[in-house]
């Protein structure tokens, strides 16, 4: 998607989320805007568009590699995150390494990393993976994450959901209009 196309779509969604956009009596539902860190290509555009429309969003943060060659939770992004905090947005975990929870087996969960390697995580390791962005975000902004998390790729397992809940994080999935290849993949539980 081109930057121009992305900007137009983002502006439309942000406009719908503003107080003026939802003040219509016929519209009784709430629209929640959420963004995952990704490669941060559109980070500034997202921030500008949200500010222009006075819209708030929830950002799910992971320490992902950015187009600049650093990571989204490196100190080089501190000013960006501090500004979003000052604007009143909400923040949740998108896991530290942005891996994919693949399958539960006995008391372990298979976790595939971005480089293709697979690890097995117990409940404590699952919690550590979800909590680690909170520690870094606090270092960068002085603010803790909200007790929310979103599984990378929308992939959860029964064990990851249970472990995350036990360590205080509520899972927030994607809407059916997310960017997954098929509707069936949305919040798919593997295992």
Language-model segments: which ranges?
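A substrate-binding/cap region within the structured catalytic cores of diverse enzymes
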Residues: 119-126, 159, 163
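Charged, glycine/proline-rich intrinsically disordered loops and linkers
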Residues: 102-121, 187-191
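Bacterial N-terminal signal peptides
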Residues: 11-21
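Basic- and aromatic-lined ligand-binding clefts that recognize polyanionic substrates
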Residues: 140-164
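Active-site beta->alpha N-cap acidic-glycine motif
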Residues: 24-105, 114, 129-147
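Bacterial N-terminal signal peptides that target proteins for export
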Residues: 1-11
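His/Asp/Glu-enriched short active-site or ligand-binding loop at hydrolase and phosphoryl-transfer sites
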Residues: 155, 160-191
